[in-house]
Structure formats: structure tokens, C-alpha cells
Amino acid sequence: MSWRKDERRAERGYHHGNLKEALLQAALDLIAQKGAAGFTFADAARMAGVSPAAPYRHFRDRDELLASIAQRGFEQFEALLTQAWDDGRPDTVTAFERVGKAYLRFAREEPSFYSAMFESGLPADANPTLQAASERAFAIIRAAAERLAAMAPPGMPRPPAMMMALHIWSMAHGVASLFGRGDAARRKLPMSPEDLLEAEVLIYLRGLGFPTDRRPEPKPAGPPPVPPSGAPPSGPWGTPK
């Protein structure tokens, strides 16, 4: 009987329905302190102020708790990338640079989510809901890469959009993980992580022969204007004399 009393005492102050959120927040705090692999299920319970048995009401194990955090992270990540991409406005290169900067901003401002998403060691296909959230976020990068691939000059071999998406994702992830998370122990840079990533992307695109000027893509030409009724037609050199 005594352990039930202890459990009730430990959970005092938690109303029905918010224990799950308390556990998620506790896990985020622990990730910030110890990393995604540095805490146990019991640690999360202790941080939330509940008994070791309480988390099992909402999560099968620690991996399921981490998967739930990673899923939320990918949902926030998708929203941020979508806003940054803005359907490629005002031009593809500028919009893509915004996506890269959004990637770095997420890693810097949401380090616990970022760690759960990319450093927890969870198998990507073990949780269908998590996998779907991850794919939706990556779809933004792939859509942007498809627009970049379409910029290939005529007659030049066009790399597969998926390959370009993976290349540029690797660049963004590398800069974010190595330099962009505000960790004082990480190597100092003589430039901002955003400037480093922008230079990498431009060098990559120019190496492929892509134009990298920031001009809006031309719109399809419409029919020529109709001259006023009774007026002689004008050619490319003006009105004939």
C-alpha cells in the first residue's frame, strides 16, 4: 500500500490530462542537459515529479517518448521550412537560401527537438507517424531542389532532384550540427553559419553550371498586344513609315 501512497504524493499537482505534456517537457529538459541518449525513462519520470511507473500510462518505453518529441519537432520544422520557402518567391536562389537559414535557426533555437530528431538513434521506419512527419519536412527541401534542377542551362545534364536535395540537406545539416547550435565548446568561425552555408550552396550551384543571380524567373510569354483598331501594325523596329 505504501508505494501507492508515494505515487499519489509524487503526482500531486498534476491534473488529469497533463501528465503526458509534463513528461514530454521533462524529456526535452533532460535532452538539453544530457543529450538524447543521456537519460532513462525513470529520469524523465523523476524530472516530471511522478513515480517511475507513471510514464507507462502514455508511453510504451523511452523510445516512444523520444519518438513523440521528434515527431513534434519535425512538425515545427516543416512549418518553418514551408514559411521560408514561400513557394520560391521572389526567386528560387533567394528562397532556397532562406530555407537554409531556417534550418540553422531551428537547430539553434530548438536544440532539444533537433537532437531528438537527428541524434536519438531511433530507426526512421520504426514509427510510421514519426516517419511521415520526417518525410513531410524533407519534401520541402526536395521541392526546392526540383525548382533548382529546373534552372539547369539548356543542353546541360540535369542532376536528379533527389540527389540535389540530399546534397544540400547534407550541407545544411553539417553546418547546423558543427557550427550553428550555439554550443560554446564548438569550433569558432570567422563568419556566421548562415554566411558559410550560403557560400557552400552558391559554390555547389555554380560548380554545376547553374545561374545563381537573384532575378525572378521569367513568366511564360503571352500573346502579342493587339494594336488599336485602324492603326498600322508595329514591327520590332517601330511603326513603318
Predicted regions and their residues:
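Short secondary-structure transition hinges
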Residues: 109-143, 185-190
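Amphipathic C-terminal alpha-helical segment
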Residues: 147, 166-187, 203-214
